Amino acid sequence: MVEVRKGNFFQRWLYRNYRQGSALGNFFSRRIRPTAWLWMGLGGLSVITGADLRQSVVVAFSLLMLGVLAVGLIWALLRRAQVVATRDLPDTGSVGEELSYFVNVTNVGKRALREIHFREQGDDPRPTEWEFLNLKEPGEEDRNIFDRALAYYRWKWLNERGGKWQSLGRSKVLNLGGGESEEVRLKLIPKRRGVLVLDDLRVELPDPFGLFQRCRPTGNEVGEILVIPRRYKLPPLDLGGQSDLKIGGETASTVKGEGGEFMGLRGYRPGDSPRHMHWKAWARTGEPIVKEFEEVRFPRYGLVLDTNLRGSGPELFEEAISVAASFVSSMDQERCLLDLMFVSDEPSVFTAGRGVAKADRLMEILARADGNDEGGYDLLNSLVLRYATEMTSCVVVLTGWDEEREEFVGSLRQSGMKVHLYVIGAGEMPEEEGLLGAHWIRWDAVQEDLMKSA
């Protein structure tokens, strides 16, 4: 379980100052190129060493550098651009996997644009106050007391991993005459699941020396990409159950249809599909006749996701989503059915498998799933038990461990259902009776612990 802290006044003051300072630094870094910082550093050094006006060479060099910087800055500020852009985006992406797309840009102005670039402004990487107060940089406990108190390295670490997506640089150099269009390729890496919004494509207008650049917005529509959760590699799964065949259609099964071979003809029974009617035999006998097939029966599994954030927090919830997505992508749904169960605004069940829906549908649902910090486990417990008799076994993914969750798991086990329990937690697994047979997955070592869970 992750201990939730509200933080003291000093920590909240640090957060506000780091956040404001980061915004200011980001503004200048977009407009001042590294070469300009180098020139300004050399200029300052030459001023210090050239304090003696008799050293005419140093003075001349200082004035030259100052002049170049001034010309470059004024040039960049005076550049203008009228550009319209249209993105050609893929429907989906995946967390942690590079994604590329094309943008058609048009210079709607009369003046030609030379040596320009295009860049999608990345998502704000700054952490929330909750993240700054409650998440620790790996190895933070080994730092000295000064670094721990100021939490600068924690802020830096959170920024490196923050934001929903990260831009991978700018486009190639373009030269656009008035009214001309060209297609450019841009890349990014999604860092969080959900709907990725692209709404700030900028054209960069540098000065001739490459010291400064002006960043102007383009006329563009908002683009969206659905980012599915990160998926981890799982060891071989043995959840029990296998598909089998049953002759006839009298016994109810999970999936009915022409999955098996044709067996023969029989008389019509109420409920038989019109698609199975044998019209020639009906015309010959005068009685409705239907074709009979072997009925394929598939095992049905439950995948129960804990969306309760109490005592855990968003980080553990995100890893629980990824673990659930890993199970969805790993199961052979041509040979089974999979019920995804969780509680959002209300108890929900989504089924994928042969004859129902594809796994992609469950991935989209997981990409949009939200956590909540209200309510207990009564609704989820009732939902799972309602389908217990239909399920071969059930995979339960929890976002922490406490008394409420222990009672929930105990209720499922008492029903006679075979439960495969995965608990996303912090630190080592507590020695508790309710966790016997469970797979404890540390939120910061998910892949390693999943491979040990075989």
Predicted feature locations:
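Acidic, low-complexity intrinsically disordered regions
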Residues: 9, 33-35, 71, 151-153, ...
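Intrinsically disordered, low-complexity regions
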Residues: 11, 234, 287, 432-433
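Long hydrophobic alpha-helices with heptad-repeat/coiled-coil character
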Residues: 5-30, 170, 249, 253-289, ...
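Acidic, glycine-rich A-domain
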Residues: 329-454
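Extracellular/lumenal glycan-associated context and N-glycosylation machinery
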Residues: 1-86
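Short linear interaction motif-like sites in intrinsically disordered regions of transcription factors
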Residues: 14, 38-40, 131, 280, ...
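An amphipathic, basic-hydrophobic helix/alpha-beta surface used to engage anionic
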Residues: 67-350, 393-397, 411
